[in-house]
Amino acid sequence: MSDGKPSGEDTVDARKEKGQGTPFLTDAGVDYTDAKPHSDAFQYNMNYGSLGQCVIINNKNFHRKTSMGVRNGTDEDAKSVMATFSKLGFKVSIANDQTVSEMKNLLTKVSREDHSKSAMFVCVLLSHGDDGMIYGTDGAIPMKTLFELFRGDRCTSLVGKPKLFFIQACRGTGLDPGVESDGESEMETKRIPVEADFLYAYSTAPGYYAWRNVIQGSWFISSLCEMLLKYGKQLEIMQIMTRVNHKVAFDFESYSNMPGFGGKKQIPCIVSMLTKDLYFPK
């Protein structure tokens, strides 16, 4: 990490390999009517009674059968996320150490609630992971299984509204050694794709480890919270996420006692299916 000597070891959110130590739809569309006209056809409407919910799932301790270690530092992430999204105006809730069934049941319950008076929805997942998978305390579940609960054909009160998922978890076991660089609408009924209006912000690129400092929390979540607090009332969400990418890419480097794990880099991966610009209300 930058800013002088790191205050704790960096580790990863993934399964331990053998001999390794601890660190480590068819698019059918749905009909909807936008009852509130937009002043800007390319900007999401934030004029609702509530900004919306931010649901945090924070998994730290795992059953022995999973071979997953304790995610030290994740409570720091959870605390930062709670403070950041509360300040932005969200109604924040947190569920700690959730099994696979508990994760699915929780998000199923939330997806079936009435969000008609909310402008958007946010979910933050803090856990171990693998390619396309996220871990509950007792095993793994495909991330898509959780995401699709909020599709337009399943959660109709969030149709046409932004649904943001932030995922701090590994997506494989690849290590990035880094490389040297030289410098720097109207009221009408429409049909939209059921997968529209989602944004997935992954802590790392597909196939790679995601780093987490055991004392300070993860690189991605700490950077996300810092940029949201700094620019959340000014910039569009993709501009904010670009700054998150920049901070993680340039300001962090792994410090680890594990052979081959030191001096590694990380780049978040932002997948957007948003159909308009998203600005948090001032």
Task: Locate each region found by the language model.
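Cysteine endopeptidase catalytic domains of the caspase/legumain-like
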Residues: 1-282
